[in-house]
Amino acid sequence: MDYPKMDYFLDVESAHRLLDVESAQRFFYSQGAQARRATLLLPPTLMAASSEDDIDRRPIRRVRSKSDTPYLAEARISFNLGAAEEVERLAAMRSDSLVPGTHTPPIRRRSKFANLGRIFKPWKWRKKKSEKFKHTSAALERKISMRQSREELIKRGVLKEIYDKDGELSISNEDDSLTNGQSLSSSQLSLPALSEMEPVPMPRDPCSYEVLQASDIMDGPDPGAPVKLPCLPVKLSPPLPPKKVLICMPVGGPELSLASYAAQKSSQQAVAQHHHTVLPSQMQHQLQYGSHGQHLPSSTGTLPMHPSGCRMIDELNKTLAMTMQRLESSEQRVPCSTSYHSSGLHSSDGVTKAGPLGLPEIRQVPTVVIECDDNKENVPHEPDYEDSSCLYAREEEEEEEDEDDDASLYTSSLAMKVCRKDSLAIKLSNRPSKRELEEKNILPRQTDEERLELRQQIGTKLTRRLSQRPTAEELEQRNILKPRNEQEEQEEKREIKRRLTRKLSQRPTVEELRERKILIRFSDYVEVADAQDYDRRADKPWTRLTAADKAAIRKELNEFKSTEMEVHELSRHLTRFHRP
């Protein structure tokens, strides 16, 4: 049945016209949200009277559904109501009780488990989780939006630009993003390509160095002559903490053996010099030959370092340094010698080792990038140059803390073991000496004479105690020790033997005991008779005995008692014969 939509008041006459009492009740309960929106003013008895004077207009207070949002329906209707009576009716409807009439439906009882919904609300758990994810994603988006571009960081002075002779610039970070001994391993090493641009005129000062490419070194005018590295235009400033050494590893392919060597001694000596060069022949050997003397193609492409690879680089660096230390102790290798000439710094060739075919096996020695920290603040920030980012630019300080926390998870077990050993050594070295303990009155101060006196005192105490013990004679006098002779002891033993033999010899035999009616075994008391075998579970023959059989058994037993055993006169009446 299609009912009309009820938005406002429904008076009695229209209700009478629509349907009878039962269908009206069904209609009001079936219309969920629509019936709630309307303020229903039905009398308790619809059949009572039809005139408006006799109509009872008490409000029927309906129970609100829990799924309905609270007081929205009443608020919506209250805009359409002008009188104060209707508002009071709305307030009366908010209570959960029904005013029962003659034809109103029965009051809905709440179940026993209705209060459980107040405690356990599993439908809200998923909402909480989704809110949590929303909060975290919003925070991440805010952090990402707050990240500044590399150009802004250059303007602020967080990053500095390093210009080569060729006009290309590479950016190094002032933070400790790449510290001593860090290797940059990628499929292609990012190195500046040769161009015919004129270098900017620069004063000769302490500078930061970049590793030139193997092709640049080989194609030079004199392959044997040392190549000078470009310098930064900087001013002289007072000396600052020691230089950072950045290690760039050239990677030729999967067959290239990756080995890193931290050339700290050579870098520390190189700090004092203003102009340094690298031998091109050594660079050729390093970049062109693999582990087994294979020719490797030199790659000239540039590849930027991503922030995600920085942590892996740190870990690679640690493990490579550890493996190099192990190799140094196990293998015989040619030491990396550093010699200074008038032209500048020379680095030794790769460590050679005989291969399987007799060919010299060449290990990779890492090329070193020396970064001068003397004039960090005086570096010019010019955005006109093209930049090829060789090194990784670090984020702001907030992200640094997060990365430090994550990097702590990557520490190897070997490093933890070394830390434990170091801490143990520190604890042992911090143990106080005997003199310190004596000064703090923890150990008493004693000379050799005092120790001898103490020993003598202890010895006299012991001898006095031993001398105070009673002698054997005193114990005999007190009857604690009894004097014993061997003859007396032997006589006592003989006496014991005689006593035992006499007892054994005087024991009567079994026959004598039977004659005296002193029986030893149970079989001597009972005459054994053969009995028929029967099933002890199923067959029970004594249940089949009649009264005459029982009387005969009793008579036989009493006769045996009267003949075999003497019965006392007072108990003879108990042995009388039973008549069958």
Swiss-Prot record:
A motif (Nuclear localization signal) lies at residues 108-129. GO terms for biological process: actin cytoskeleton organization; actomyosin structure organization; cell motility; cellular response to mechanical stimulus; cerebral cortex development; dendrite arborization; positive regulation of gene expression; regulation of modification of postsynaptic structure. RPEL repeats lie at residues 138-163, 422-447, 460-485, 498-523. Selectively expressed in brain. High levels are found in the olfactory tubercle, nucleus accumbens core and shell, caudate-putamen, cerebral cortex, hippocampus and piriform cortex. Moderate to high levels in the olfactory bulb, arcuate and ventromedial hypothalamus, subthalamic nucleus, amygdala, lateral septum, habenula and thalamus. Low expression, if any, in substantia nigra pars compacta/pars reticula and globus pallidus (at protein level). Disulfide bonds: none annotated. Keywords: Actin-binding, Cytoplasm, Nucleus, Phosphoprotein, Protein phosphatase inhibitor, Repeat, Synapse. Binds three actin monomers via the three C-terminal RPEL repeats. This is Phosphatase and actin regulator 1. It comes from Rattus norvegicus (Rat).
